Amino acid sequence: LAQAKNASEAKRMLYKITRNAEEARSAEAFEAEESLSNAESVKRRLCNSYARGDFFDLVSDVPDAGCNVIEIDPPYAINLQGIKEAESIITEGYTDIAPEDYPLFLETVFTESYRVLMSSGWVICWFGFQWYPEVRAALERVGFSVCHIPGFWVKPTQGQTRSPETRLAGVVECFLYARKGKEVLRKQGRNNLFLYHPAPPSTKVHPTERPIEMMEDILTTFVVPGGQIMVPFLGSGNTLLAAANVGMRGFGFDLDADDKYRNAYVNRVVNKKGDKFTSYAETT
């Protein structure tokens, strides 16, 4: 709290500290239970699908050709921490990649992704605009057939910019999608714009968190219910919750050294209300 710039920021930091502690206690209590109902067994499976650890260390245990889709939201190598700090957004626990290491990092991730995909499958990869050539080239080098026009998340908000006098406020993020084999889209004819508000700040647990509702839409654009998804960099874990909403099985990894994000994820699973996980309804 001593690092807070003002009283308002100190209150936000204290709130986050308190919430993190409560989520950690909730996660520990749930995972310690011995007798589980069927619904609780499903929750336990979802909790266990979030593995804490380095993707590069753990992916070797994933068998070949077992996944229908892989959703990759890697570090962007754009000094996100510096950008978010300038915008007073806390990025504690976020790990970035040095620009000089990024091409090799990408190719290693894509090589493993190609291995664990079935003979026909999709990879979805989010990226920073300045890395478009490198991301596309790395996907193609390992064998993927890449659609050269990205998909776009369009946020109907005011947007963000650090230099309003010279730069327009950004309201879009983008992903490349590529296929292995002869896989086809499930929502054929759908356009490449996904119009969704960001996850509400009051419930957001990760600096790059994407709304569950949007991830559900994206997943069902590419694969049918019942498929399996791997998420190399889980963050908030919302992709796994979106997958569960549409009857998909999923698993993934995150470094998350202090279990902050995994505890928040487990807390969401344990305290699920209604038939589906959601980002937006949590605020109502």
Stretch-by-stretch model annotation:
Residues 1-51, 282-284:
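Amphipathic alpha-helical oligomerization/scaffolding segments
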Residues 48-253, 257-260:
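Core catalytic lobe of class I
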Residues 263-266:
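Conserved SAM-binding loop
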